[in-house]
Amino acid sequence: MNIRRFKESDAVAVSAVVIKTLRISNVKDYPAELMEEVVKSQQPQNILERASWTHFYVVEDGDKIIGCGSIGPFWGKEDESGLFTIFVLPKYQGKGVGRLIMETLEKDEYFLRAKRIEIPSSITGCQFYRKFGYDYKNGVAELDEERLYRLEKFREI
């Protein structure tokens, strides 16, 4: 397994990883119709746009992309960052790929400069992120209007 920065040529493969994961893993926690709406926003052009303002990483097994994750400024703030688009192909879940992504994101300069890091978390990923010390924003353990949990972690910098 190897983790590296995203290249534009990865967009189609990353989109496929995200979409497959949404349709197999996330659909267990959300209606299929909602997942198909989310799929529309995870096309290669959407991935390229997100990669333009984040530090986007991919995990490879050989030459196959099996996971991804990104970190970027939270609404343009210098001292707050957000984690986005963290997905691992279902076949590779539970094998340390997600941990590798999180460890990499938490070494990135956007993480290291931030006092607060926020994750818009799916129901599917919530407990995974909580293992890394992220907790419910303002203590609110309820889904927001996007049907996501807002998780956050504070750091001393």
Residue ranges and their predicted role:
Residues 21, 108, 128:
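Short alpha-helical functional segments enriched in proximate histidine and acidic residues
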Residues 88, 94-107, 131:
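Conserved acetyl-CoA-binding loop-helix of GNAT-fold acetyltransferases
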Residues 60-62, 153-156:
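Active-site beta-strand termini and strand-to-loop segments that position acidic
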Residues 1-12, 154-157:
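Conserved N-terminal entry element of GNAT/NAT acetyltransferase domains
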Residues 128-129, 134:
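Conserved hydrophobic/aromatic "anchor" residues
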Residues 118-120, 135-151:
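Conserved catalytic-core motifs of GNAT/GCN5-like acyltransferases
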Residues 5-9, 16-90, 102-104, 142:
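Acetyl-CoA-dependent GNAT
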Residues 102, 109-122:
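Conserved GNAT acetyl-CoA-binding A-motif
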